[in-house]
């Protein structure tokens, strides 16, 4: 069941769902608008290969802090970013990260791993791809995506406690920690 605005507000007021900071204007009929943080991770153009087993690969990413003047995503560029909001989901809610259609219509694809497991806590790392042939300029603090909440039939027996639990800011891939 997708949560409506009334239930989202109720869960927040009861402390079951945490989203910080949050202004009531961000709560939509069936989602919550999340805003863009100012921290970006960029893949350098001189990287020849990404080795998923290399635990030091993320050290090669370039960290940029955007100002109110904005951040430019080049054509065909992939960039990691973060939300301002820190969220904490209970063990009976899951969430989907959805890009805003207004940005999609400009060619900016937001997230390609948009599932948030029950029990997750942290900032949401966003994956951006500029599919356009011209640069796109975005700004810290702007509404960048929507979080849609779904109530599960029952509480999760094993809520999320994975490698991204508690992440703050833009977080690079930690795939090298996978056991498979």
Curated annotation (Swiss-Prot):
Pfam families cross-referenced by the UniProt entry: DCD
Catalysed reaction equations from the record: dCTP + 2 H2O = dUMP + NH4(+) + diphosphate
A GO molecular-function annotation: nucleotide binding
Site (described: Important for bifunctional activity): 114-115
Active site positions: 127 (proton donor/acceptor)
EC numbers, comma separated: 3.5.4.30
InterPro entries: dCTP_deaminase (IPR011962), dUTPase-like_sf (IPR036157), dUTPase_trimeric (IPR033704)
Top-level enzyme category: hydrolase
Gene Ontology terms describing biological process: dUMP biosynthetic process; dUTP biosynthetic process; nucleobase-containing small molecule interconversion
Domain of life: Bacteria
Annotated binding of dCTP, by residue: 100-105, 117, 125-127, 146, 160, 167
Keywords: Hydrolase, Nucleotide metabolism, Nucleotide-binding
Pathway(s) this gene product operates in, as recorded in its UniProt entry: Pyrimidine metabolism; dUMP biosynthesis; dUMP from dCTP: step 1/1
Reported function: Bifunctional enzyme that catalyzes both the deamination of dCTP to dUTP and the hydrolysis of dUTP to dUMP without releasing the toxic dUTP intermediate.
Oligomer and partners: Homotrimer.
HAMAP family listed in its UniProt record: dCTP_deaminase
Family, per entry: Belongs to the dCTP deaminase family.
Protein name: dCTP deaminase, dUMP-forming
Native organism: Sulfurihydrogenibium sp. (strain YO3AOP1)
């Amino acid at each position: 069941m997708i949560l409506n605005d009334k239930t989202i507000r109720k869960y927040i007021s009861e402390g079951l769902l945490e989203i910080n900071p949050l202004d009531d204007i961000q709560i939509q009929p069936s989602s919550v608008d999340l805003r863009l943080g100012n921290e970006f991770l960029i893949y350098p153009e001189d990287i020849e290969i990404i080795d998923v087993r290399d635990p030091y690969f993320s050290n090669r990413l370039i960290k940029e802090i955007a100002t109110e003047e904005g951040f430019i995503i080049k054509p065909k560029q992939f960039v990691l970013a973060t939300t301002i909001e820190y969220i904490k989901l209970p063990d009976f809610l899951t969430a989907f990260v959805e890009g805003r259609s207004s940005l999609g219509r400009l060619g900016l694809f937001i997230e390609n791993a948009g599932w948030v497991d029950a029990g997750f806590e942290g900032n949401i790392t966003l994956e951006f791809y500029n599919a356009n042939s011209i640069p796109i300029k975005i700004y810290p603090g702007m509404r960048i995506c929507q979080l849609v909440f779904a109530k599960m039939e029952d509480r999760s027996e094993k809520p999320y406690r994975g490698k991204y639990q508690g992440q703050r800011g833009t977080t690079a891939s930690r795939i090298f920690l996978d056991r498979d």
